[in-house]
Amino acid sequence: RGNYQYNLMDAHYRAMMAQVPMIAQWDDHETVNNWYPNEILADDRYTEKSVALLAARANQAFHEYMPTGEWLVEPGRVYRKVSYGPLLDVFVMDFRSYRADNSGNRQAKRGPETAFWGAEQIAWLKREMLNSDATWKVIAADMPIGILVRDGKEAFENGANGDGPVLGREHD
């Protein structure tokens, strides 16, 4: 909450928020860098080591300070559809809350360790996109879907793993 309150102290930020439409996006820096739900922090700067608890607190603050509540179907859920008349549906995704533990992201078969989007969110996206009559359908993702983001020399941080067979989080 303190970080959100700090931003609101800036008059320019408040003016922008009052004048510019915004779709708030949830990612890792609301909690800790590159987090996943089952993570236990080894960083001594944190008195709370459970990332799941930190993420729950961050999620609550996010929804208290960011313009999301109007579209939420379920309290605390980040993924949602934002419609702008008959022309545009924006599908806002959450690539943090449903992901498996960070790994080398090179698994050959789909399994619990390759989760990225989460089965429920994927089913929701498919259903909502099929039911959408909007001319334009935009997926707003907090991480690049098809861009390679290296995590060391051999692993990749997001969903894409480069050329070759489907591996790791690409299964989602």
Across the structure, where does each feature detected by a protein language model lie?
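Metal-dependent phosphoester/phosphodiester hydrolase catalytic core
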Residues: 1-172
